[in-house]
Design a protein with these regions (language model features):
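N-terminal first-folded block
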Residues: 1-37
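Residue-level recognition of beta-strand microenvironments
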Residues: 6-9, 13, 46, 81-84
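A generic local secondary-structure boundary/capping motif
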Residues: 14-17, 44-46, 66-69, 92
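A structural micro-motif recognizing beta-strand termini
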Residues: 30, 44-46, 60, 82
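Short alpha-helix capping/helix-loop boundary micro-motifs
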Residues: 39-43
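C-terminal structural segments of small proteins and small subunits
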Residues: 56, 62-96
Length: 96
């Protein structure tokens, strides 16, 4: 799993039929301070995240374990919206 921030949306009118109805988001991976950590991916959004939100992603076969993504050609899924990130007992991120 990796933490990222949704930075955009992908619109595709022609795609694999198994992806029809899936919301595609662009996610930039971030460190625990919210700074870019290198890496941008397109992910299927399973939780209704919006642009600017901090999210938790899963990749590889783990991305195909949600009811929305099972048996679909997906490599990365947004599986949670982060409300609070706590490191060593200190809150380093709180959702606005």
């Amino acid at each position: 799993m990796q933490i990222g921030r949704v930075i955009g949306t992908v619109v595709s009118t022609v795609k694999d039929e198994k992806l029809e109805g899936s919301k595609l988001q662009v996610v930039e991976f971030v460190d625990v301070n919210g700074k870019p950590a290198g890496g941008i991916v397109t992910a299927v959004d399973a939780v209704g995240a919006g642009v600017g939100e901090m999210v938790l992603t899963a990749a590889g076969s783990s991305a195909r374990q949600t009811p929305l993504t099972k048996d679909k050609p997906i490599d990365t899924v947004i599986m949670a919206i982060v409300d609070v990130l706590e490191i060593g007992g200190k809150e380093v991120y709180v959702k606005p």
